[in-house]
From Swiss-Prot:
Organism encoding this protein: Photobacterium profundum (strain SS9)
Protein name: Urocanate hydratase
Subcellular location field: Cytoplasm
Pathway as given in its UniProt record: Amino-acid degradation; L-histidine degradation into L-glutamate; N-formimidoyl-L-glutamate from L-histidine: step 2/3
E.C. number(s) listed in UniProt: 4.2.1.49
Keywords linked to the UniProt accession: Cytoplasm, Histidine metabolism, Lyase, NAD
Reaction equations catalysed: 4-imidazolone-5-propanoate = trans-urocanate + H2O
Length: 568
C-alpha cells in the first residue's frame, strides 16, 4: 500500500457524534457519564470546527488522538467504576487505575514536551507519527462549549476598552480584527454587545457563513469597500453592526493603512499561534495551502510568518495613527518578532491591558453545561445566579444578553465571569437544584484554561507580571495537583494552548454536580481552591488587589503579608 492510500486514522467522514441527553445513563454513574457526554459534545457538528478529523478549534486542537483512541475512551468511560481513574496521554487512553471515590475519574495530559524540545518542529514530528496530539485548551480537556465559551471574556475586554479609551461609550466606534474560527468567532457578537461595530477579516468563507447562521456576525462582505460602507453606515446611525469580510488579514490590514483609515480599535484572533495549520499566507488559496502542508511544511511556516509580519507592521502603523491596538492572545507579535519586526511588542497584550485586575480576585471564565440537554436547566441556573449575586447589574445584563442573543451549540451551556467570592456558592446551589429536582439532570462546571491561576503564558495571561515571574510555570502544575487533591471529576494539564508550542503551560478542571452530598463537598472544595490559586499566584507577585482579596476571603498564604507588603 502506498503512502497516499494509507487511511488517515484521524479522518472519518462517516462519523457524526452527538452527545446523549436526558437521564438515561450510558456509563455506570453520572461521574463517568459526564466526561463521556462532554467528550462527545466537543465533537458535535455544531460545536467542533472539523469534527470528522476530531478537530474542535484552534488550528488542530483535538478531542482525541485518532478515531481508534476516541472509540476506546468511550468504551472505557462506559465501564469505568467510581473508584477507578482513566489516564489519557495526549488523547490516548493508556491506563485505568484503582483510586478512590473522591479522586478524579479522568486525568489528562496533552501536548506536554520537555522544554528543550518544546517547539512546533518536534511536536509536528511526533504528531505525524501518531505519538501526540495538540489539545489546545478545552479541546483535549472536553469542556469546549462553542464560541460562547469566549464571548463573555471578549465582551469584558471590549467593555474595558470602551471605559479606558472612550469614556465608557462605544457608540459610533468600530473594531478591526481578523479570524472567525472557534475563538475569533466570538468577537463580532461580543463587540456589538459592548456597543462597538466590527469588521472581521476571515479567509475561510465557510466560517463566515457559520457565524451568520448562528447569529455571531450580522453580515458578509467580499470586498473591503463593501465592508467599510457597512461600518460607515453604522457610525452614522449609532447602531452597532458586525461584518465578516472574506479576505486575507495581512492584505486587508495593509490596505486599510494605505487608505489612511484608522479603526478605533485594532486587534486580531487568527490562529497565528500555529503558522503551519492556522494562518493563510498572502497570495495563497486555501487549497494551495493544504497541498503545500503535505509537500513542504517549512515553506508554509515561513510564508505564514512573513505574512504575519506584514499584518503586525500594519497594526503598529494603526497604533501610531491613534488606534487602540492590542494583541488578543494568539502570539502574532512573537511570530512577527521572529521575522524581524523588532518593535512587534510595542502594542500590549489584552490581559495586562484590561483583564489582570479581574484575575487578582480569581475572576475568570466560569462555565457550566446542562447534561439533560434541556435549555430550561440553563435558564433556571441563570436565575439562580441573579438571586445569589443580586448587586451586580453588569453580570445581570450579561446573562440577559446571553439568553437573548447567544444560540446554544450542542449541549446547552452558559459562561459568566465570577471569582473566588462566588464560584463555590454557585456550584453548591446548582448541586442543590439537581438534588431537589429543579434541574432535570446533573450539571458540569468547568472553565477555560485561560484563568487566573491555571496558566503560565508570558505572551498572554502572564505577560508583564510585576515581579518578573511571567515564565514561571509551577503555578498551573500546582493548580492541577490541587484540583486533583480537591476531588475534581476530571483534571487536565496541557502545553502550547492559545499561543503555540513552547509558549504556555496550563491546566483545567471539571466538576460534576450530581445532587449528592458527596458532590456538594467536592464542589465546595474545588470551586474554592481552584480560583484561590489565582489569587495566591497574583498575591505572591505583589498585586495589592490580590493581597486584599486573599485577606478578605481568608486565604492562608504564609509568605504573603496581608498588610499590602510582599515578603520575598
Amino acid at each position: 500500500m502506498t503512502q497516499s492510500t494509507i487511511p488517515n486514522p484521524r479522518l472519518d467522514e462517516s462519523r457524526t457524534i452527538i452527545a446523549p441527553t436526558g437521564t438515561q445513563l450510558n456509563a455506570k454513574s453520572w461521574l463517568t457519564e459526564a466526561p463521556l457526554r462532554m467528550l462527545m459534545n466537543n465533537l458535535h457538528p455544531d460545536v467542533a470546527e472539523h469534527p470528522h478529523a476530531l478537530v474542535v478549534y484552534g488550528g488542530i486542537g483535538r478531542a482525541a488522538r485518532n478515531w481508534e483512541c476516541y472509540d476506546k475512551i468511550v468504551e472505557v468511560l462506559k465501564r469505568l467504576e467510581d473508584d477507578e481513574t482513566l489516564i489519557v496521554q495526549s488523547g490516548k487512553p493508556v491506563g485505568v487505575f484503582k483510586t478512590h471515590t473522591n479522586a478524579p475519574r479522568v486525568l489528562i495530559a496533552n501536548s506536554n514536551l520537555v522544554p528543550h524540545w518544546a517547539n512546533w518542529e518536534h511536536f509536528n514530528e511526533l504528531d505525524k507519527e501518531g505519538l501526540m496530539m495538540y489539545g489546545q485548551m478545552t479541546a483535549g480537556s472536553w469542556i469546549y462549549i462553542g464560541s460562547q465559551g469566549i464571548v463573555q471574556g471578549t465582551y469584558e475586554t471590549f467593555v474595558a476598552m470602551a471605559r479606558q479609551h472612550f469614556n465608557g461609550d462605544a457608540k459610533g466606534r468600530w473594531v478591526l480584527t481578523g479570524g472567525l474560527g472557534g475563538m475569533g468567532g466570538a468577537q463580532p457578537l461580543a463587540a456589538t454587545m459592548a456597543g462597538f461595530s466590527m469588521l472581521a477579516v476571515e479567509c475561510d468563507e465557510s466560517r463566515i457563513d457559520y457565524r451568520l447562521r448562528t447569529g455571531y456576525v450580522d453580515s458578509k462582505a467580499t470586498t473591503l469597500d463593501e465592508a467599510l460602507a457597512i461600518i460607515e453606515e453604522s457610525k452614522q446611525t449609532g447602531k452597532p453592526v458586525s461584518v465578516g469580510l472574506l479576505g486575507n488579514a495581512a492584505d486587508v490590514y495593509a490596505d486599510i493603512v494605505k487608505r489612511g483609515i484608522v479603526p478605533d480599535v485594532t486587534t486580531d484572533q487568527t490562529s497565528a499561534h500555529d503558522p503551519l495549520n492556522g494562518y493563510l499566507p498572502q497570495g495563497w488559496s486555501m487549497e494551495h495551502a493544504a497541498a503545500m502542508r503535505l509537500e513542504d511544511e517549512a515553506i508554509v511556516v515561513k510564508a505564514a510568518k512573513q505574512s504575519m509580519a506584514v499584518q503586525v507592521q500594519a497594526m503598529l502603523a494603526l497604533q501610531e495613527a491613534g488606534s487602540a491596538t492590542v494583541d488578543y492572545g494568539n502570539n502574532i507579535r512573537q511570530m512577527a518578532l521572529e521575522e524581524g519586526v523588532e518593535n512587534a511588542f510595542d502594542f500590549p497584550g489584552f490581559v495586562p491591558a484590561y483583564i489582570r485586575p479581574l484575575f487578582c480576585e480569581g475572576i475568570g471564565p466560569f462555565r457550566w453545561v446542562a447534561l439533560s440537554g434541556d435549555p430550561e436547566d440553563i435558564y433556571k441556573t441563570d436565575q439562580k445566579v441573579k438571586e445569589l449575586i443580586p448587586d451586580n447589574p453588569h453580570l445581570h445584563n450579561w446573562l440577559d444578553m446571553a439568553r437573548e442573543r447567544i444560540q446554544f451549540q450542542g449541549l446547552p451551556a452558559r459562561i459568566c465571569w465570577v471569582g473566588l467570592k462566588d464560584r463555590a456558592r454557585l456550584g453548591k446551589a446548582f448541586n442543590e437544584m439537581v438534588k431537589n429536582g429543579e434541574l432535570k439532570a446533573p450539571i458540569v462546571i468547568g472553565r477555560d484554561h485561560l484563568d487566573s491561576g491555571s496558566v503560565a503564558s508570558p505572551n498572554r495571561e502572564t505577560e508583564g507580571m510585576m515581579d518578573g515571574s511571567d515564565a514561571v510555570s509551577d503555578w498551573p502544575l500546582l493548580n492541577a495537583l490541587l484540583n486533583t487533591a480537591s476531588g475534581a471529576t476530571w483534571v487536565s494539564l496541557h502545553h502550547g494552548g492559545g499561543v503555540g508550542m513552547g509558549f504556555s503551560q496550563h491546566s483545567g478542571m471539571v466538576i460534576v454536580c450530581d445532587g449528592t452530598d458527596d458532590a456538594a463537598e467536592r464542589v465546595g472544595r474545588v470551586l474554592r481552591n481552584d480560583p484561590a490559586t489565582g489569587v495566591m499566584r497574583h498575591a505572591d507577585a505583589g498585586y495589592d488587589i490580590a493581597i486584599n482579596c486573599a485577606e478578605e476571603q481568608g486565604l492562608d498564604l504564609p509568605m504573603v503579608n496581608t498588610k499590602n507588603t510582599h515578603s520575598k
